[in-house]
């Protein structure tokens, strides 16, 4: 029986990737990605469903990798994705958790400690906290900085995925806050060679001790 939550929580890689295409997703998986979020804001439901089915088949071929769908709960359930990620302003976390299978990963965006605690109390698997730094992916995002990230980490006892402006050279300061994973979009996807960029980030994260090592 596949246990997505176990795979997510025990994953030794500390880089959380994003894709809007199977081609990019496969390149990242081949480079070592084991956590990928499928995120395509402009695709209609039919196109996104088809993309999700294809991407899930690709992820399954890599064994221990997991695919998390952004926002589209119905499609995540229908295609039996490993997880769903929702923004706190988009959908009620309790309602999402009530609807999805028990083994499905549920991530919730939470910029500050109070909403992070609410997400954890609702049963979220992890919270996504940021933007840690200014980011070209979402220029309007409020920047919480390392201090704000540290406050979110201290407020919950579930993993925190840090997001926003994280690039090569910035992994260790982020992980030093206690965040479990670093989500990287533009630092990988906009690089001349996304696979090489991911490998550099994975190497940087591997040099930082895990909770089990300390």
Can you say where each PLM-predicted feature lies in the sequence?
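Phosphate-binding beta-alpha-beta segment of Rossmann-like dinucleotide-binding domains, i.e.
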Residues: 134-142
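Conserved N-terminal beta1-alpha1 strand-loop-helix module at the mouth
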Residues: 1-93, 97-126, 141-144, 151, ...
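Acidic, Mg2+-coordinating phosphoryl-transfer loop and its flanking beta/alpha structural elements
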Residues: 180-184
């Amino acid at each position: 029986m596949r246990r997505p939550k176990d795979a997510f929580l025990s994953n030794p890689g500390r880089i959380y990737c994003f894709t809007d295409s199977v081609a990019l997703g496969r390149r990242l998986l081949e480079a070592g990605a084991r956590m990928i979020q499928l995120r395509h804001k402009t695709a209609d439901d039919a196109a996104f469903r088809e993309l999700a089915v294809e991407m899930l088949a690709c992820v399954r071929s890599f064994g221990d990798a997991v695919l998390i769908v952004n926002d589209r709960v119905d499609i995540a359930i229908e295609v039996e994705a490993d997880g769903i990620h929702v923004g706190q302003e988009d959908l009620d976390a309790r309602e999402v958790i009530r609807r999805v299978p028990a083994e499905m990963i549920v991530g919730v965006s939470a910029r500050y400690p109070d909403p992070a605690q609410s997400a954890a109390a609702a049963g979220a698997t992890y919270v996504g906290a940021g933007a840690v730094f200014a980011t070209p992916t979402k220029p309007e995002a409020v920047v919480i900085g390392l201090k704000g990230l540290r406050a979110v980490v201290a407020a919950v006892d579930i993993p925190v995925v840090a997001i926003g402006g994280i690039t090569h050279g910035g992994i260790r300061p982020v992980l030093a806050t206690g965040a479990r994973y670093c989500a990287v979009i533009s630092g990988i996807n906009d690089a001349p060679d996304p696979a090489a960029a991911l490998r550099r980030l994975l190497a940087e994260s591997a040099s930082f001790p895990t909770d089990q090592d300390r």
